[in-house]
């Protein structure tokens, strides 16, 4: 095959011309003198049509029938070079169609296990390496790519520097009960839960920094919102106030949604996502409500017919049903700010005049998707941080470098983190986080 290949996504530029496409057979149908071949090449899907009389006319009866028979016998996922004339076709769901003039098989496909019918979740996850080829799974990956692209673009435009934090560490950033431990030349080491502590060092050097990479949490959870390995974007910045941080987070999330609308509209269409809702999340301001006001709201509405959550008192943490109700009540992504210090991380700065609350925020996505961002102002006073660590019985020697940051020109600073898979799930409108990453790692699943 010596002809120049084009991508399916570019066929609109070749109407009336003969082109060659390298693709896989996603499906086929037809009978008698006509065969329909649905093609995919990673950029998009496209339909080719083969007419038996045309093949006989071009190649002669014997060769024409042989070539047409090859097309009729194609198995799903056979890889091919297919040549034909691009035609506009309003009747086609793709908008264009390929009048096939030739087809060459590159790689035969055996009987493909994932056929166009319903399959159980365990079967699909066992065959994840093949399930990724389906239209909806490809669409989710395209949305993931658009979100990652928009992340780098946003932080570059806002003066942040990419700062890589280590994957291996000897201490924990968050809950030490959720660590994966490994041997590091005879010493215990842990897979990173977050790059935050190291990013704070970066912010003291470079002002505004972010990292993006895999993190690991040994959560024995089987919910639709948890993975043991996922990708996290953490950002850290100096000299920003809490309100300015919330403004930045809101702008970031809106930039991610806009990035998907711009770069992957066809993926949203395949997934039948409510695009008007996504546009509204961009145009309308996010809501901001204090933790205590949110608790009061929950208490006032817990007897409503359409509520389904347990009673909470001030000082209790939210569960998923509470987060869902809060975000749906306001109808847009909602910041819940100033949680109790009792169940938040040691490094969070107290609310001035109210040491029982901390300057933090969780961003709750509507439509039942829950928390997608967590952030806070960091305690920048050395003595206050030491006192908090003593109160919690923490070994300060494990955090000597972190404490040093408060001894040499400490400044007000804060940061936030977003689990990319949760954002992908929200924007894509899918039901389970396992579809938001190519090969999910969950409780009881570490292959393929």
UniProtKB/Swiss-Prot annotation:
State the InterPro entries in the record.
Aa-tRNA-synt_II (IPR004364), aa-tRNA-synth_II (IPR006195), aa-tRNA-synth_II/BPL/LPL (IPR045864), Asn-tRNA-ligase (IPR004522), Asp/Asn-tRNA-synth_IIb (IPR002312), NA-bd_OB-fold (IPR012340), NA-bd_OB_tRNA (IPR004365)
What protein name does the entry list?
Asparagine--tRNA ligase
* Keyword Lipid biosynthesis set for record: no
Q: Name one GO biological process term.
A: asparaginyl-tRNA aminoacylation
Matching CDD domains:
AsnRS_cyto_like_N, AsxRS_core
Family recorded in the similarity comment: Belongs to the class-II aminoacyl-tRNA synthetase family.
Question: According to its UniProt record, what is one Pfam family this protein matches?
Answer: tRNA_anti-codon
Subunit comment for this entry?
Answer: Homodimer.
């Amino acid at each position: 095959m010596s002809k120049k290949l084009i991508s399916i996504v570019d066929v609109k530029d070749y109407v009336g011309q003969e082109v060659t496409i390298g693709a896989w057979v996603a499906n086929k149908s037809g009978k008698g003198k006509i065969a329909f071949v649905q093609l995919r090449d990673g950029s998009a899907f496209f339909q080719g049509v083969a007419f038996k009389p045309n093949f006989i006319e071009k190649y002669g009866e014997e060769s024409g029938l042989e070539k047409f028979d090859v097309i009729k016998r194609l198995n799903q996922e056979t890889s091919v070079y297919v040549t034909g004339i691009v035609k506009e076709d309003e009747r086609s769901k793709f908008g264009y169609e390929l009048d096939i003039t030739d087809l060459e098989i590159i790689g035969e496909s055996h009987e493909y296990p994932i056929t166009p019918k319903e399959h159980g979740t365990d079967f699909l996850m066992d065959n994840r390496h093949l399930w990724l080829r389906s239209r909806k799974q490809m669409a989710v990956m395209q949305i993931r790519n658009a979100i990652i692209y928009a992340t780098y673009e946003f932080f570059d435009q806002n003066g942040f520097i990419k700062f890589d934090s280590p994957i291996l560490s000897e201490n924990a950033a968050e809950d030490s009960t959720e660590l994966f431990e490994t041997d590091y030349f005879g010493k215990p080491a842990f897979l990173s839960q977050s790059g935050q502590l190291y990013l704070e060092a970066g912010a003291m050097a470079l002002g505004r920094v972010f990292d993006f990479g895999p993190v690991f949490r040994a959560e024995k959870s089987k919910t639709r919102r948890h993975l043991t390995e996922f990708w996290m974007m953490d950002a850290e910045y100096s000299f920003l106030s809490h309100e300015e941080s919330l403004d930045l987070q809101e702008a970031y999330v809106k930039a991610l949604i806009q990035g998907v609308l711009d770069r992957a509209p066809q993926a949203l269409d395949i997934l039948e996502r409510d695009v008007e809702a996504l546009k509204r999340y961009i145009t309308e301001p996010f809501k901001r409500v204090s933790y205590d006001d949110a608790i009061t709201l929950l208490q006032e509405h817990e007897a409503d017919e359409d509520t389904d959550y347990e009673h909470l008192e001030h000082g209790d943490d939210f569960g998923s049903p509470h987060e869902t109700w809060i975000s749906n009540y306001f109808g847009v992504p909602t910041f819940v700010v100033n949680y109790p210090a009792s169940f938040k991380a040691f490094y969070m700065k107290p609310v001035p005049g109210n040491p029982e609350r901390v300057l933090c925020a969780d961003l709750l996505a509507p439509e039942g998707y829950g928390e997608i961002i967590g952030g806070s102002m960091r305690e920048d006073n050395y003595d206050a941080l030491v006192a908090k660590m003593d109160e919690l019985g923490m070994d300060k020697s494990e955090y000597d470098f972190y404490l040093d940051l408060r001894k040499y020109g400490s400044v007000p600073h804060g940061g936030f983190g977003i689990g990319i898979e949760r954002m992908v799930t929200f924007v894509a409108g899918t039901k389970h986080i396992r579809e938001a990453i190519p090969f999910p790692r969950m409780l009881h699943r570490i292959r393929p």
